[in-house]
Amino acid sequence: AAAMAFSFSTQQAQKYQCLPCGYDCDKEIHDKPGKCAHCQMDLVPVGSIKFKTIQPGQLCDYIKKHPNTVLLDVRTKEEFEGKADPNFGTLKKAINIPILDLEANLGSLAKLKNRDIIVFCSHSHRSPRASYLLSQNGFKQVTNMAGGMSVMPPGPCVQMK
């Protein structure tokens, strides 16, 4: 009788983490997809997050050292223009593509795929989703600003409208 050989492969169960919002829950690992109980961000597969995070207090210095950085404000047009209450201002030289329009505009942004891009919003709820969308679509150097404009200290890169 021929001997039967069995091979068992142990498949690692997929783990999930929340889209980085800049808070401690970013470090928590979950067993299934869903929403983060702390920040309500979507839970995505560990390893699928390919963007970095920068703290608001580091931003003006970073922009000064990297003047060709694309600053992408994903808030509404009203927020970007300072017509929303409260008005948190924006970053000088920022471009505005509201998150709801971002996916439809990926084609027109293709020329920026290899540029340094910092994505921000008001409270770091929309910008992590936008950063994830960009990084999943071939944008190589995407950074999310933690906390958003609501916690941005005054500085030479901030513009009140």
State the predicted function of each range.
Residues 59, 70-75:
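Short hydrophobic beta-strand that contains or immediately precedes a catalytic carboxylate
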Residues 25-27:
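Extracellular adhesion/carbohydrate-binding repeat motifs centered on closely spaced tryptophans
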Residues 23, 123:
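Local cysteine-cluster metal-coordination motifs and their immediate loop/turn environment
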Residues 119-121:
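Short, surface-exposed ligand- or partner-binding patches at beta-edge/loop junctions that are enriched
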Residues 1-3:
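N-terminal export leaders
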Residues 8-19, 30-65, 78-116, 125-161:
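Rhodanese-like catalytic fold shared by cysteine-dependent sulfurtransferases
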